[in-house]
Curated annotation (Swiss-Prot):
UniProt GO MF annotations: bioactive lipid receptor activity
Organism name: Mus musculus (Mouse)
Family: Belongs to the G-protein coupled receptor 1 family.
UniProt key word Phosphoprotein: no
Protein name (record): Probable G-protein coupled receptor 174
Segments in the Extracellular topological domain: 1-27, 75-91, 156-182, 253-268
GO cellular component: centriolar satellite; intracellular membrane-bounded organelle; plasma membrane
Pfam families, A to Z: 7tm_1
Tissue specificity annotation: Expressed in spleen and, at low levels, in brain. Highly expressed in developing and mature regulatory T-cells.
Description of the deletion phenotype: GPR174 deficiency appears to favor regulatory T-cells cell accumulation in specific tissues. Knock-out mice are resistant to inflammatory shock induced by lipopolysaccharide (LPS) and cecal ligation and puncture (CLP). GPR174-deficient B-cells have a defect in CD86 up-regulation.
Cystine connections: C91-C168
SUPFAM superfamilies: Family A G protein-coupled receptor-like
Keyword annotations from UniProtKB, A to Z: Cell membrane, Disulfide bond, G-protein coupled receptor, Glycoprotein, Membrane, Receptor, Transducer, Transmembrane, Transmembrane helix
Transmembrane segments: 28-48, 54-74, 92-112, 135-155, 183-203, 232-252, 269-289
Amino acid sequence: MTDNFTCNKTDGDNTDFRYFIYAVTYTVILVPGLIGNILALWVFYGYMKETKRAVVFMINLAIADLLQILSLPLRIFYYLNHDWPFGPGLCMFCFYLKYVNMYASIYFLVCISVRRFWFLMYPFRFNDCKQKYDLYISIIGWLIICLACLLFPLLRTNDDTPGNRTKCFVDLPIRNVNLAQSVAMITIGEVVGFVTPLMIVLYCTWKTALSLQNKYPISQHLGEKKKALKMILTCAGVFLVCFVPYHFSFPLDFLVKSNEIKSCFARRVILIFHSVALCLASLNSCLDPVIYYFTTNEFRRRLSRQDLPDNIQLHTKSYKIASNHATSTVAAELC
């Protein structure tokens, strides 16, 4: 009894620290993530018909990021006020969006990596690949992710707690589930939602890097390979920074909240580690627009409006040609 009381007190001592980390992280992410992803959607829509290079997947990735960003003000409110006055339905929906964003981001980062890899390694086979196929892949991915992520809110309960304080997000209690079933669900989720996508991204990175070692590369192909490797490496970097720590800490956090881990010191370390990992997982909404800017020439060109002077010159030349033609016609008629 005393040990349980001591551990509960230790967990409670971590609460203010964890709330502070969450509030600061989400505040930092909110404005840059919102502006960056809205700009990304505008840019991608503008040159969607000009390229076949994974633009559909990038659009879906930006949409996934916006889903999480739009819920951040409510998360910030909760972690600053330590209370949720907006009802259990909205709490569960925002909680659900977090996981939809995470696994949609993982899915579309994999799609972008595979698309660039295939387009580079098998250009003739995939050169005529239409964007509608990417659209079908995106729709199927959204359906699977949205259905699979329903497990996260279903495994939580939002019963009110004493003291007129309503819990939400990381404080939602876990329902009583058999340990064997819990381990099975976590294992399947980790393998399907994290390990397999990570292996695919690392494989694409490895094979693309090997292709640069060709002794007689054509300069144009070498440039394309370097661009593709840059894109795939950036996707792998975001994957490793944002999602690896979370998927290491998630099973441990689940065991803590299920009271399977009894050591007070271990509980304290795991709760802090999971809080940091959760913040890193949220950073992907802010980092994805950086991927677009530094790895996509069309994105930089349109965002910097470098194509604007060309358009102005084109319209000016057209106007001059039309004016000269009209002048010549009038002169001929007068003669």
